């Protein structure tokens, strides 16, 4: 199944219902550059990746990075993989995930990274990982 087709289909089917349950506004989309870009976001709720991807509208296809454990969730793991999620094994230096992300960025696309590598609750102090900086410096 074509990744771009599934991404667009999910956007058109899921977003109208999701936005009713979680109304959000997006500001600053005009600051997203053309070409490859690393989008870094806070991650405090389970729905954050969906909200960020859908807030970017269909103008850009945003590929989020997600923990590999999600790939093992029946049906959801398959669907997310087909929609373009780059699974990363946070317990190891995941060379495959890094190469896939760099390739995507070099093709001029958008990559969504949560710098802490996990959800962070309000008041928690979690040190960020170096992945976002690595992607930005390696792709210019």
Write out the residue ranges for each language-model feature.
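Soluble catalytic domains of membrane acyltransferases
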Residues: 3-7, 11, 18-140
């Amino acid at each position: 199944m074509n990744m771009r087709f599934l991404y667009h289909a999910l956007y058109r089917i899921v977003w109208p219902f999701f936005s009713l349950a979680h109304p959000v506004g997006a500001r600053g989309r005009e600051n997203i550059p053309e070409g490859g870009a690393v989008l870094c976001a806070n991650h405090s709720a389970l729905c954050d990746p969906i909200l960020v991807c859908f807030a970017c509208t269909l103008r850009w296809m945003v590929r989020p990075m997600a923990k590999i454990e999600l790939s093992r969730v029946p049906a959801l793991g398959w669907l997310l993989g087909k929609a373009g999620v780059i699974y990363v094994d946070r317990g190891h230096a995941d060379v495959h995930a890094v190469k896939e992300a760099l390739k995507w960025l070099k093709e001029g696309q958008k990559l969504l990274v949560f710098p802490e590598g996990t959800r962070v609750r309000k008041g928690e102090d979690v040190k960020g990982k170096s992945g976002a900086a690595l992607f930005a410096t390696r792709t210019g």
